[in-house]
C-alpha cells in the first residue's frame, strides 16, 4: 500500500529543505520521525509533520481497503522538494536605493509504502 502527503508553499528555501529530506529518504517511517524530531534544521519541523501526515494517510487508506495496517512496515520510498513561487520584497537602502529580497518557497512531497511494495519499485 502506498500513501502520499504534499506540503505546498512552505516558507523554507528549497536548498535547505532538500538537506532535511535527504536525511530520511529510504528510511523506515518511525526511524525518520525520530531523526526529524532531533534534527537542528528549521525545515525539519514541517517535514516531520509531512511524514506524520503520510503515515496517517496510509492508515486511512488501509482502513478503507480493509487491509491490516502495520506502521513499522512503512518506508519512505520517495521524498523530494520542488521550488515554489518566490515572493519578491524590497529592502530600502541609502540614497533612495532599494535591494530586492527573494523569499523562496518549497513544495515538499513524501510517499510512504509497505516494505513488500518498496522492493517491487
Curated annotation (Swiss-Prot):
What CDD domains does the database record attribute to this sequence? Ribosomal_L22 (cd00336)
Query: Which BP terms does GO give this entry?
Result: translation
Determine the domain of life of the protein's source.
Answer: Bacteria
Pfam families from the entry? Ribosomal_L22 (PF00237)
One Gene Ontology cellular component:
cytosolic large ribosomal subunit
Matching PROSITE patterns: RIBOSOMAL_L22
Say yes or no: keyword Magnesium present: no
> GO: which molecular function terms?
rRNA binding; structural constituent of ribosome
Q: Provide this UniProt record's keywords sorted from A to Z.
A: Ribonucleoprotein, Ribosomal protein, RNA-binding, rRNA-binding
Q: How does it assemble?
A: Part of the 50S ribosomal subunit.
Function description: This protein binds specifically to 23S rRNA; its binding is stimulated by other ribosomal proteins, e.g. L4, L17, and L20. It is important during the early stages of 50S assembly. It makes multiple contacts with different domains of the 23S rRNA in the assembled 50S subunit and ribosome. The globular domain of the protein is located near the polypeptide exit tunnel on the outside of the subunit, while an extended beta-hairpin is found that lines the wall of the exit tunnel in the center of the 70S ribosome.
Question: What family does the database annotate?
Answer: Belongs to the universal ribosomal protein uL22 family.
Write the protein's name. Answer: Large ribosomal subunit protein uL22
Amino acid at each position: 500500500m502506498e500513501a502520499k502527503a504534499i506540503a505546498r508553499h512552505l516558507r523554507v528555501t528549497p536548498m535547505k529543505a532538500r538537506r532535511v529530506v535527504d536525511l530520511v529518504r529510504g528510511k523506515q517511517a518511525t526511524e525518520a520521525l525520530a531523526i526529524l524530531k532531533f534534527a537542528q534544521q528549521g525545515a525539519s519541523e514541517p517535514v516531520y509533520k509531512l511524514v506524520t501526515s503520510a503515515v496517517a494517510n496510509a492508515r486511512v487508506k488501509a482502513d478503507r481497503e480493509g487491509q491490516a495496517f502495520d506502521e513499522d512496515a512503512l518506508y519512505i520510498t520517495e521524498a523530494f522538494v520542488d521550488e515554489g513561487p518566490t515572493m519578491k520584497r524590497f529592502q530600502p537602502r541609502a540614497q533612495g536605493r532599494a535591494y530586492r529580497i527573494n523569499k523562496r518557497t518549497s513544495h515538499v512531497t513524501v510517499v510512504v509504502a509497505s516494505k513488500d511494495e518498496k522492493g517491487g519499485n
